Amino acid sequence: MNNLAEKKCIPCSLGTPPLSSDEIKRYISQLHEEWKVINDHHLEREFKFKNFKEALSYTNVIGQLAEKEGHHPDMLLSWGKVKITLFTHKIDGLSESDFVFAAKVDKQQSE
């Protein structure tokens, strides 16, 4: 889908500004259409599954990806669905790494 998935998540330094609205628009266009930008602050996408067990298994897959990348999303697990929320806590907003991680999630979904 894009080359964002080939990049690495890189930690931000304190004081790094969050992405601008224009930068966010450029990055979001490279992700699956189900990703939503909320208040120019975070990304969200909900994934649906047949049951709780499959949803739980998916959180573990994404958890392994998060550990590998050193970038950790918020995940809300409920029956048959997982909502992933991404933003960079250190800068309280979106960074390139949030979009890189989202692209890696998209790639994981397509495999």
Swiss-Prot record:
Enzyme class, spelled out: lyase
Protein known as: Putative pterin-4-alpha-carbinolamine dehydratase
Keyword Lyase: yes
Gene Ontology BP term (one): tetrahydrobiopterin biosynthetic process
Lineage, uppermost ranks: Bacteria, Bacillati, Bacillota, Clostridia, Peptostreptococcales
Pfam families, per database record: Pterin_4a (PF01329)
Keyword Lyase attached: yes
Superkingdom of the source species: Bacteria
Catalytic activity: (4aS,6R)-4a-hydroxy-L-erythro-5,6,7,8-tetrahydrobiopterin = (6R)-L-erythro-6,7-dihydrobiopterin + H2O
Family the entry assigns: Belongs to the pterin-4-alpha-carbinolamine dehydratase family.
Xref: CDD domains: PCD_DCoH_subfamily_a (cd00913)
Enzyme Commission code: 4.2.1.96
